[in-house]
């Protein structure tokens, strides 16, 4: 769920009710005011993608040793910085490119999410099919957000008080638990506790998509949209 500009010329309401939204916005505004001129939104988008590659590399390399997970944790920080700052800096400097920014940002988000979840699935801690199931749930919610912009004029950046930043913090905490517990078999044989956690998150995301789709459909019917 990105932080760039609205794709439509008509006003779009940004729905952002995650727990850290206000604190994060203050931090981003503080950082924007101190960014040197050579730091551009495009550079920050690139930095965000570099962070996603770091996460992928850290998880996949953890097959060689748990210490590589520190690279994944560092990648989350880099990815947050680039992904959160690119749109914020564009708006701060009033150099928005609404259509281009929206298209590139969401395209990069999709690739970054794939890198992160594929990395988790290629690690010794989580099965690939479980990680890809969670990715599917996240991408379905992203699709819902994109559709809401078009049909409701709303950009949903959070669900149940959680957004991308909260999800990154959860994944960082999970990665620290991976380092502490190792990749030994769990109580359920081939299915580890990490599989259950990631699979559970995926199930929640899928359920949220279904509920939000139902809610949006009822809203559209109420305002006379019957395509």
What is each PLM-predicted segment?
Residues 1-73, 119-227:
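Hydrophobic alpha-helical transmembrane segments
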